[in-house]
Amino acid sequence: MPAQIKAADSYNKDKKGSITINLDDVKQGDSITNKSGVSVSIYQVASIGHDGVNISFDIASSLESTGVDVNDITTSDKNLNPAKKLTTVIDNSGISSVTKKTDSNGKVSFTDLAQGMYLVEEKDSASYGMFSPFLVAIPYMEDGQNWIYDVETYTKGVSNQQGSLEVTKALVYMDPETGKIYNLQAPKSYEEN
C-alpha cells in the first residue's frame, strides 16, 4: 500500500467507499476448504483529515495508546503488525464493527463506507481456515494520480487444521560399562482386595 499522505488535487471529500474481500483457496490435505459463511468484521479505526491540499488519517482516540501510526503503512509488514496490535484492543475500544458472511465464492462486500482507515478481521472461520487481520484505507492512491474509493482485496488464508502427535514413552537403562541398552517394564498395577 503506498504512503497515505498524498496531494489531494482530485480528492472528493464527500465520496463514499467500499471494501470487497475475496478469500483465497486454502488447501487442507487433498481438498480445498469451504469459503462460504466465513464471518468478517470491519472497524473504522481512523477518520480522514483534509487540509485542502493533503489528506491524512487520524486514529480513533480510544486507540491512541497503541502507538499505531496509520499514516506510515507503506509495506505489508507495516500493515500486518499494526493490524495485529489493533486486534488485541479493538473489542474494548468502544468502536463498533460491521460483520458479514462470505458468499459461496468466498466474497463479501461492505458498501457505503465513510472515508477512513478500516481494520479487517476474521471473526469465525466456519470451515475455511484463517487469514491475518489487515488495514484498508479509503481512499488510497495506487498510481500517484487517481484516488481509489472502492477497494478490493484478496486474502491469503492458511489452514487451521492441526496435526496430530503421538508420544510413546519407553523406560530404558544403559549399562555404563558395556554400553548395552535394556528395555525395562514397569510392574503391572494391581488392585488390593
What are these regions (language model features)?
Residues 1-193:
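Solvent-exposed loop/turn and edge beta-strand elements of beta-rich ligand-binding domains
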